[in-house]
């Protein structure tokens, strides 16, 4: 009996159609990334080897990844990696996957400070180290501390620091917001944060991809502002005079977060930074003490 031959081109075509039937947003791209991961090749290789037959071991490895994607797990959590700001982060389904929106915050900080600055950075809700490690990579004289309550996220953050050769310049600590710093005299030049900010009532509007990420990293209470209130209230205790804050916010939260900072009477030069979609995605301010 003639055995069916699955080439790279044929399996990609089948996968694209299958993902389309599941109403995936990027069916072709998802299939390409998953197959590239299985083969250990880049996506260009797929197009230059379209007629290459896949061996049984490759098909057996590919099938469960397709099934996971069909269940709504993100491609990044399936492959265990996500490219962000020119770096490849290790990720999994226990952490918030790095998103393009967050690049707006990092690019603003890099525009604010000179490349040779020797600032100290604190990252609250660091997750896999997305913001802090990206900044340290591009600011070679800076050092930083990353805090997170998740004992699942911190080992990944440390692995990423090791991958990027940053372990000597960064420390990660388990901490419920600022709890690990209370009672210390630590001061920082910059505090960054991408805290959970989705309103709990908005869960029904989220895609399955997002809902499969840890809810502790997504939801910021009924109004989405629980963690911004803590940041506004407590950042000043750990900032040098004229230090700065930079927070990622939900697409409609910038004005409210500005008011929270203003209400402390400690901040000036409060600004919004828009993302590529034109939404104010970052709130920054200078601490005056």
Q: Model regions: which residues?
A:
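Conserved AdoMet
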Residues: 2, 35-111
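Non-catalytic accessory regions of SAM-dependent methyltransferases
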Residues: 1-39, 45
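Conserved hydrophobic residues forming the short capping helix/wall of the S-adenosyl-L-methionine
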Residues: 19, 161, 235, 261
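Short loop/edge segments at beta-strand edges and connector loops
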Residues: 174-175, 249, 274
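Core SAM-dependent methyltransferase catalytic element
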Residues: 262-289
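Conserved SAM/SAH cofactor-binding pocket of Class I
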Residues: 104-204, 209, 230
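Glycine-rich S-adenosyl-L-methionine
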Residues: 147-151, 208-240, 244, 250-252
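Conserved beta-strand segments of alpha/beta enzyme cores
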Residues: 88, 143, 169-171, 268-271
């Amino acid at each position: 009996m003639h055995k069916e031959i699955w080439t790279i081109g044929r399996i990609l075509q089948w996968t694209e159609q299958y993902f389309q039937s599941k109403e995936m947003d990027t069916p072709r791209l998802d299939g390409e990334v998953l197959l590239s991961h299985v083969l250990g090749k880049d996506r260009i290789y797929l197009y230059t080897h379209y007629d290459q037959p896949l061996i049984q071991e490759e098909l057996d490895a590919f099938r469960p990844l397709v099934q996971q994607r069909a269940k709504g797990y993100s491609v990044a959590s399936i492959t265990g990696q996500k490219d962000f700001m020119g770096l490849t982060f290790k990720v999994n389904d226990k952490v918030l996957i790095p998103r393009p929106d967050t690049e707006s915050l990092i690019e603003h900080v890099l525009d604010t400070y000179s490349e040779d600055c020797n600032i100290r950075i604190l990252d609250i809700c660091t997750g896999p180290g997305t913001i802090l490690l990206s900044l340290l990579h591009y600011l070679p004289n800076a050092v930083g501390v990353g805090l997170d309550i998740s004992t699942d996220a911190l080992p990944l953050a440390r692995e990423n620091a090791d991958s990027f050769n940053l372990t000597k310049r960064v420390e990660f600590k388990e901490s419920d917001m600022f709890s690990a710093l209370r009672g210390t005299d630590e001061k920082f030049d910059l505090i960054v944060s991408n805290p959970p900010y989705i309103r709990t009532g908005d869960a029904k509007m989220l895609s399955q991809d997002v809902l499969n990420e840890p809810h502790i990293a997504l939801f910021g209470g009924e109004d989405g502002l629980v963690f911004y209130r803590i940041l506004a209230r407590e950042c000043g205790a750990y900032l040098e005079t004229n230090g700065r804050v930079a927070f990622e916010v939900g697409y409609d939260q910038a004005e409210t977060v500005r008011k929270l900072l203003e209400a402390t009477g400690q901040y000036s030069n409060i600004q919004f930074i828009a993302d590529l979609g034109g939404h104010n995605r970052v709130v920054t301010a200078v601490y005056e003490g």
